[in-house]
């Protein structure tokens, strides 16, 4: 049996909090990023991530569950056709919260919550190229370090030979 959340709720009553989170999630999926208070952003994050996980599954049952929360069919359509497939290979962490300072009027701490962009093919190719560059740089460093060690080894031998000549 579901238990009500302990402590203060956003907006006063449980029903108002439920509607507030649904509207915040709708705006987040519609615009990709929204500016809100830190408290609302922290409450929205797990709520929105559960909806994205349902969208990733993409079956009728999950679509109907999301439609119970977000009543705008166009937003649900974009959630299931664009946002869900975008995070197909991502196991979680679909949102990011960035603090942006306090609001001017009431000094409330504000934050931006946004959908994290999934890696596109171009970004993956760039990442692979950077990894290859780093690997080649490490290989080059290893090659330059190996001759340096050989040079260091020859110096003590030369010094030892000079010392034996002096004796």
From Swiss-Prot:
Residues 124-167 are annotated as: Disordered. GO terms for molecular function: structural constituent of ribosome. Disulfide bonds: none annotated. Residues 131-167 have a biased composition (Basic and acidic residues). SUPFAM superfamilies: Prokaryotic ribosomal protein L17. NCBIfam families: L17. Part of the 50S ribosomal subunit. Contacts protein L32. This is Large ribosomal subunit protein bL17.
């Amino acid at each position: 049996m579901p238990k009500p959340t302990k402590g203060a709720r956003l907006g006063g009553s449980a029903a108002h909090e439920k509607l507030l989170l649904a509207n915040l999630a709708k705006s987040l999926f519609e615009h990709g990023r929204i500016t809100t208070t830190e408290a609302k952003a922290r409450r929205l994050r797990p709520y929105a991530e559960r909806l994205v996980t349902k969208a990733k599954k993409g079956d009728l049952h999950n679509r109907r569950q999301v439609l119970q929360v977000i009543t705008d069919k166009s937003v649900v359509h974009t959630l299931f056709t664009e946002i869900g497939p975008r995070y197909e290979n991502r196991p979680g962490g679909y949102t990011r919260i960035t603090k942006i300072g306090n609001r001017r009027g009431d000094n409330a701490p504000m934050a931006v919550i946004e959908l994290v962009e999934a890696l596109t093919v171009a970004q993956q190719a760039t990442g692979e190229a950077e990894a290859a560059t780093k690997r080649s740089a490490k290989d080059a460093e290893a090659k330059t370090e190996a001759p340096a060690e050989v040079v260091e080894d020859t110096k003590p031998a030369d010094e030892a030979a000079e010392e034996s000549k002096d004796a």
